[in-house]
Amino acid sequence: MIKTIDHIGIMTNDLQKSVEFYTDVLGFSISAKIEMEEVGLSAIFIEKNGSKIELMGYRGAIPKRSEGIEIIMGGSSIPLNDHITFTVDDLGATVSELKGKGIEFGLEPMQVEGGIKIAFFKDPNGVLMELMEHPKQQNKSTEYIIV
């Protein structure tokens, strides 16, 4: 039976640019490199605190990533699509640090149901990234309730 997610794979348009983004901007480290020349695929695994992402480069054409949909929440438009969510201790400090590294946020951080704070940005491939700060008193087994 399933125990846990091993890694998340992301097909990139520019493998080197993606590796630089995840290592230099988000602080991941390279943990493995795989070359499959016979099929035209290169993969670089990056890791941080046990979370792994496989960045893949392909010599053929990469289909355009879905634009997703947008929902209105708290008076702001929030993109809703396939995404990766990173837990942070201090959303404001993390957003400031990433803005200092040239990251643009589509909207300012906001607080949602249950006191959770969120913010969104995209990686160089258009993959939606979400930052999430849980309230200090809450444990990690938070249930999400859509109302």
Regions found by a protein language model. Give the residues of each.
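Short hydrophobic/aromatic beta-strand micro-patches
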Residues: G9-M11, T85-D89
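Core segments of cupin and vicinal oxygen chelate
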Residues: M11-I53
